[in-house]
Design a protein with these regions (language model features):
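Beta-strand-rich N-terminal accessory domains
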Residues: 1-92, 246-253
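Extended, loop-rich substrate-binding clefts of extracytoplasmic carbohydrate-active enzymes
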Residues: 2-8, 93-152
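Residues that act as N-cap/strand-start positions at coil-to-secondary-structure junctions
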Residues: 8-10, 21, 31, 77, ...
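Intrinsic-disorder/low-complexity, polar/charged segments enriched in Ser/Thr/Lys/Arg/Asp/Glu/Gln
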Residues: 11-13, 22-24, 122-126, 143-145, ...
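Acidic, contiguous internal or C-terminal segments within carbohydrate-active enzymes
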Residues: 16-18, 28, 129-172, 176-178
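Hydrophobic small-molecule pocket/channel-lining residues, especially in calycin-type beta-barrels
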Residues: 41-46, 55-60, 75, 106, ...
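Glycine-rich, pocket-lining loop/helix-strand segments that form or immediately flank
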Residues: 46-65, 90-110, 192-195, 200-213
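Active-site/ligand-binding surface loops and adjacent short beta/alpha elements
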Residues: 169-170, 179-253
């Protein structure tokens, strides 16, 4: 396994490489995002991530879909960008889609490479960003560490650690917004979840706090003709049970 880094347009592009299988992972320090996960198959290589063409493309189009973005310190939509914490009202000054703030404050942040490791069994990198509380609507400093680890069997893992740098507890949530692809139209792919609980959204895609029974994906559902812009409440993850699987005849993610 190897780790290599090049500089591009003021950022770092990191590649994790399994020399045995040929699997490659491309990561940007811009947003600590996963831009490519290239996997050898019987019919050639497939990139399982719908990424950007370059760093410049990512910088220019980060909010046009938030492809592979890290979502911190809040995920999805926040109604009118407002929330209440410890009896005080705050209004986020981040990115708004329509009337509502969306997908946190670090999706376009510059991360530093703080650790790399390459051995016979893994290639890994840690990106870190120190948020200093600069948004008046979120004056709570924290440090976000994002670790990407490639091991044998085309296994890629992401670990996120947040360190509270404030003097007391802070409001915080974290997520990831990947765009997966199986190398062709999604209509030929099958999607399965370990849940039948879909989160209910309002017309503005804000969570209502309710769930809807949706059994379509428990045993696997072909995506032909299906539109999804929803969240599902997954069962507890375990090392031996995949929470979500997307596959076609060529590749399984």
């Amino acid at each position: 396994f190897t780790v290599s880094t090049i500089h591009e347009s003021g950022y770092e592009v990191v590649e994790l490489h399994d020399q045995g299988s040929g699997t490659r992972v491309q990561l940007y320090s811009f947003g600590a995002l996963l831009n490519a996960f290239t996997i050898p198959t019987k019919t050639g290589t497939i990139n399982g991530i719908d990424g950007f063409t370059s760093i410049n493309d990512a910088v220019a189009n980060a909010t046009a879909g938030f492809k592979s973005s890290k979502l911190s310190p809040f995920v999805c939509r926040m109604q009118h960008g407002k929330y209440r914490f410890n009896q005080k009202e705050y209004t986020i000054n981040g990115f708004y889609l329509g009337e509502h703030a969306i997908h946190g404050l670090l999706f376009n942040a510059a991360f530093d490479i703080t650790y790399t490791k390459s051995t016979a069994t893994e290639a890994s990198v840690i990106f870190s960003h120190q948020y200093k509380g600069t948004d008046p609507g979120y004056p709570f400093p924290f440090t976000l560490h994002v670790k990407w680890k490639l091991t044998s069997g085309n296994t890629l893992q992401v670990f996120t650690t947040a360190t509270n740098n404030h003097s007391s507890a802070i409001p915080f949530s974290d997520g990831w917004h990947p765009y997966f692809t199986v190398g062709e139209t999604i209509d030929s792919a099958t999607l399965s979840f370990t849940t039948n609980k879909q989160l209910a959204f309002s017309a503005d895609l804000l969570p209502t706090g309710k769930t809807i029974e949706d059994n379509r994906f428990v045993g696997g559902q072909k995506m032909d003709g299906i539109f999804l812009d929803n969240c599902f409440l997954l069962d507890n993850h375990s090392e031996t049970k995949h929470s979500c699987t997307l596959k076609n005849d060529a590749v399984t993610l």
